């Protein structure tokens, strides 16, 4: 498939993704609020915001790796791509551990950070831990996603993300009906992220060029460049 066709498919599928997810979200939000109090939903948003702040502990590797991976794939320089991939994986792995540790420390003081009056502390802690694990998995997945984007497979990503959004919505509905409150939102998100991470790994393994996806040697020069 030519680069132009891939680009056009990427644009079209992006619009389809935006339209369908917006429609589903317009239905899902009020549906969720029919099971969860607005104040409890606010707890979920607050906990998600805390995770976002913790994610600032990343080294900012993803943006640089995206451009480097695209450059290497364009030149078919797979030796350099392997160096960038290995170094990025190690750095993202380090970021994942750092985010996990800080997140676990925050969990110990969650009742001091968030006023849990009127809501089960178990629900708050469980939701926070699930969101934390989701964040860690996402960080570790980022270099793999960047390789696929650099290889101009964004149209496939859009289709997969759309399918996973629907799967996440279905799990959310299921968990809400089972009475899991705000835990439903975090659990369904984690399930979707685990699925997309597994699919991303398989797709990268099936690319026409071979990469060692497990962290190999750490290249200091590449680290400085990134």
Region spans (language model):
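Membrane-interface junctions at transmembrane-helix termini in multi-pass inner-membrane proteins
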Residues: 4-11, 133-160, 183
């Amino acid at each position: 498939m030519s680069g132009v066709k891939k680009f056009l498919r990427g644009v079209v599928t992006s619009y389809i993704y935006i339209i369908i997810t917006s429609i589903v979200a317009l239905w899902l939000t009020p549906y969720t609020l029919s099971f969860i109090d607005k104040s409890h939903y606010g707890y979920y948003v607050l906990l998600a915001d805390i995770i976002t702040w913790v994610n600032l502990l990343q080294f900012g590797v993803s943006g640089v790796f995206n451009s480097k991976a695209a450059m290497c794939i364009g030149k078919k320089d797979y030796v350099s791509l392997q160096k960038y991939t290995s170094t990025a994986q190690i750095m993202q792995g380090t970021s994942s551990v750092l985010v996990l540790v800080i997140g676990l420390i925050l969990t110990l003081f969650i009742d001091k950070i968030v006023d849990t009056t009127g809501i089960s502390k178990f629900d708050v802690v469980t939701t926070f831990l699930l969101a934390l694990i989701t964040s860690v998995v996402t960080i570790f997945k980022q270099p793999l996603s960047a390789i696929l984007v650099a290889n101009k497979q964004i149209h496939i990503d859009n289709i997969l993300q759309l399918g996973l959004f629907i799967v996440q919505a279905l799990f959310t509905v299921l968990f809400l009906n089972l009475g899991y409150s705000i835990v439903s939102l975090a659990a369904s998100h984690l399930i979707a992220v685990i699925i997309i991470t597994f699919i991303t790994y398989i797709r990268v393994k099936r690319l026409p060029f071979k990469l060692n996806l497990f962290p190999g040697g750490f290249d200091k020069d590449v680290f400085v460049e990134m």
